[in-house]
Amino acid sequence: ALQGFDRPLQQELAQHTSIAQWEYRQTLDEPASLETALVVLHDYLKQHHQPIHLLGHSTAGLLGLLYARQHPERVKSLTLLSVGANPAMDWQAHYYAQRRLLPCDQRTILQRMVYGLLGCPPRDRTEKLARVLEQDLYQSLSPHHLLKTMSLSPIAVEVPLLVCGSVDDTVIDPNQLRNWQQYFLHQDSRLWVCPGGRYFFHYFYAHQVSEQIIKFWNKIFPLKALVTYQNVMEIGV
């Protein structure tokens, strides 16, 4: 439901290299299962004969992180957008916390979330964006629900890791981002904090984010030397 926020960054990156987008969709009666999604993702990536760069935002980033831990030989690098040192934390965890604490209905809290995640969009777009968030509640792989929110310990991976976030994100705050640095195992792993944009900073600052990602990739393996196959895959859930 939230893939539309990824498109500006996809377009920026596509000017430099070929990009494939992998999406995992589940029906409303299917339980959210990261394990099932990992199996499906692995089946897809087995078709590629060389390691590729993985990129994911929020829960999609968590899925990429779990995959890189299981199959580092298939991952050239991993870029995480809005993924904190507690990699399970996402906007839905904040939403359910507010549902438990505040005497408000779903619609009211979703509208509050729109302002928290995006700043102050035009009033006529708030309701539309709230419906997009509602759709994500029912369709995404987020491991949280009304009765319980999930927490994960930091996951260290052997592959080069680029962690990106925003200085004004209320979901993944700068402390969550900085805590990543003690878990960097690869010498080329790094952290970059965007000057704004909140939870969807890669939508509002697509050019600046793409510059950081391209710089990161070039340090690992210059893009001008890449062969002409799908070198980058963005995960969507």
For the regions a protein language model found, what residue spans apply to each?
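Gly/Ala-rich beta-loop-alpha elbow adjacent to hydrolase catalytic centers
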Residues: 55-64
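Conserved alpha/beta-hydrolase catalytic His-Asp/Glu region
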Residues: 89-91, 106-155
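Active-site loop/oxyanion-hole signature of alpha/beta-hydrolase fold enzymes
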Residues: 7-11, 17-53
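Flexible "cap/lid" loop of the alpha/beta hydrolase fold
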Residues: 69-105
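Conserved alpha/beta-hydrolase "acid-adjacent" motif
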Residues: 170-176
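Short glycine-rich catalytic loops that host catalytic nucleophiles or stabilize transition states
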Residues: 22-24, 191-197
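Catalytic histidine-centered segment of alpha/beta-hydrolase-like enzymes
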Residues: 31, 197-210
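Short beta-strand/loop motif that positions the catalytic acidic residue
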Residues: 157, 163-165, 169
